[in-house]
Amino acid sequence: MTEHNHDSQLEINNEEELLTLYDEEGNEVLYRKVLEFFHPEFKKEYVILAEEGAESDDDDLIELVPMINEPDENGEGGKFLPVETDEEWDMIEEVVNTEMDDHDHDHDHE
């Protein structure tokens, strides 16, 4: 099995921002973007969203919603698409776990 080192190629932006999306019934739902990254192997940009106001004592209980961010012709904005392959789910889980662990350790030293 080969060892993958994503850190040298993975572009990560963890600047938080609020986004309004619509659920299946057309209701507005406010999400906080907790992580955004481009993965060179899949050549896609991903965003990890958490429903705003979905607070919990245990961070693991907050449901994270990964989406593919497909830019428009101008390379801006675009639309969110669902993640469909198991390979992408596994990669996203690995990136999120690594980033969240790093984020937790950063706060331990403040």
UniProtKB/Swiss-Prot annotation:
Q: What InterPro entries does the annotation carry?
A: UPF0473
Signal peptide (from-to): none
Task: List the Pfam families hit by this protein, alphabetically.
Answer: DUF1292
Official protein name in the record: UPF0473 protein SSP1146
Per the UniProt record, the source organism is Staphylococcus saprophyticus subsp. saprophyticus (strain ATCC 15305 / DSM 20229 / NCIMB 8711 / NCTC 7292 / S-41)
Record-stated family: Belongs to the UPF0473 family.
